């Protein structure tokens, strides 16, 4: 996450916006397909597995597309961007790291919100025939049992695994550059995290993916809706906390972050 001029920052913004757009289109699109009424796929078996794998596919093609626009992009997640920003400041500080972080965050939120708005437009007939809580699930996450401590730790640990996996995958790709395309291991990493943790909290592991789409839900004209704002801070603060903690731990380790 190093930038030499404002032009690179502009391409970084576009890459993160489009990459995050693709992530949400795939992920929340899959949730809509298996949950909204009047969808031909709403009776699909293995809904949870379908959604988990489709989120993974969203990561794969979001990262691939972002990297095609600007090499080194494809975070699609403020927690990952925070990790790389802090780690970069510790090991190789440059003037544009933090402006790049802010621009990336804005792009990720905007990409998520545009994607969710697009899904709502495309599926409006099905959405308007479905109960508000099910519609909420195609926007953002909610816990199966509300418990602040356990919900926070679930999202925190899941995000630690996500970012740690991203770092490990980056090292593998650096040492084996022609092995698999960028984002391929992210597909299985994200799918695995959702399968392991998603039943408890929905596995947001991404503030833009959760808060940006929750805002869209709040702005959508649906009767008797509840965006569950009392929970909304957990999928934001827990992933960012994981990014902060891991960046400090790895930042002072001798191993380079690629």
From Swiss-Prot:
One of its GO terms (cellular component) is plasma membrane. The chain crosses the membrane at residues 11-31, 50-70, 95-115, 152-172, 180-200, 233-253. It is a multi-pass membrane protein. Gene3D superfamilies: Glycerol uptake facilitator protein. Keywords: Cell membrane, Membrane, Repeat, Transmembrane, Transmembrane helix, Transport. A motif (NPA 2) lies at residues 206-208. A motif (NPA 1) lies at residues 77-79. Belongs to the MIP/aquaporin (TC 1.A.8) family. PANTHER family: AQUAPORIN OR AQUAGLYCEROPORIN RELATED, AQUAPORIN-9. Aquaporins contain two tandem repeats each containing three membrane-spanning domains and a pore-forming loop with the signature motif Asn-Pro-Ala (NPA). This is Probable glycerol uptake facilitator protein. It comes from Mycoplasma genitalium (strain ATCC 33530 / DSM 19775 / NCTC 10195 / G37).
